[in-house]
């Protein structure tokens, strides 16, 4: 009798030595995705800066000024309402090479009042207050060119979008292993080339290429590890695969602290990809994919290898494998199926909004922390730590309480934390950090749960399409986020947090409109998906229960 891979793994080991070995190898892949996803915090760090004015350095040296005195005497003030632009993007139109300038308040010798001196653009570049370097300091991505930093981060999310859309087809067509190794190789090459890019344009091109393949490779790793384990372990393994990403956040903070120059940082975080090429000899092809390609003999050989590694033996009867697919009529899904009926249309709209919101808040909070934090390395490290309890809370709650309430609560906590942080005064920095960490934990939980629930709300024949369409909003959000964060902070540092707060609270409220999926079988048809939120009052079932009740006394 034909059996499925899950049936065989029950005898050959669902999560034993082989699967643990594969998980460790693929978890390393998950951890190295971190620098591409949120590395903008360190690669694009914008330090305090001011216009470079010819003659100022010589005058400062002659007068023996301290850095604070040089800043006070030669640089425009911050402007009204604490606006930083005049200080950072303008300079006095003064010839500092004049010998008439004294060493004590040199501008006082001019006939014009200091506040009325004309300001000009930074023609000679900028002076940056940092011992290291970033793409901002090297390519002068400040003032009129600051939008180029937004474009840099948006480009990697554009790559994520197209890479994620195409990876499902490519992995199904050519296999998981070949696709994984190809993405790793391209990612490694593009990462090194970006580290040695001579111009901003070339750097942008190689970052886009990294985006095209890096998230795709991360997703293939996720697919592989969930296909190697038995059905009972898939959800837990999937969550811990993303915990490995969190470990990558902690490592990234340490590496960035040790390597404050962006080219060395980019080169270092790219190096592990060359190690992953050795996976050619370590990781086999997915047996499930081989069966889908009618390569049952090779699939059986790999499964026997898995059983041997696990110290298990397979019964002689388990020799004929089949896919876990129904033999019924094949349906061709379309986007219209996601919006044709009222309940599925509601599910689609809410899921798309929540994917978008999760991406905007998760990436946005990290970017905003890089702008507002006192110590970006420690702030980044501490905020990453809260992702561990977030994963633990998901594991504890989703099968006990359900999906809907933890999901809604996590969105609302994230939104409320963002709004609360706006009104905390600057001298209570410790409280601001605690509230920010709560927000980060909330949105991390929401991000994880939406991945799980997305597949549980759609019927079988449109499930994959629904997941791909809805999750694509995650990358759309990632494209918008850098423009949202960096442009709004130019108006007011806390303004992005107000936007994040509203988005999070609305997302939490919308989640409550979705049905609970805990303990429910995955819907097979549109009718089942439409009736998920309604109690079933089936007449035949009622008659059956009545007959069953009457039969009991007769026995």
Swiss-Prot record:
The record's note on its domains: Contains one proline-rich sequence (Pro-Glu-Ser-Pro-Arg) that may be involved in tyrosine-protein kinase YES1 binding and is required for the activation of substrate transport.
The entry's keywords: Cell membrane, Glycoprotein, Ion transport, Membrane, Transmembrane, Transmembrane helix, Transport
Post-translational events: Tyrosine phosphorylated.
Residue spans, topological domain Cytoplasmic: 1-21, 172-177, 232-238, 285-348, 397-404, 454-464, 516-555
Organism whose genome encodes this protein: Pongo abelii
Membrane topology: Multi-pass membrane protein
Residue spans, topological domain Extracellular: 43-150, 199-210, 260-263, 370-375, 426-432, 486-494
Description of how activity is regulated: Tyrosine phosphorylation of the transporter leads to activation of the transport activity. Inhibited by cGMP, most likely through a cGMP-binding protein that interacts with OCT2.
Motif (Proline-rich sequence): 284-288
Superkingdom of the source species: Eukaryota
Residue stretches spanning the membrane: 22-42, 151-171, 178-198, 211-231, 239-259, 264-284, 349-369, 376-396, 405-425, 433-453, 465-485, 495-515
Subcellular location: Basolateral cell membrane; Basal cell membrane; Apical cell membrane
Glycosylation sites: 72
Name used for this protein in its record: Solute carrier family 22 member 2
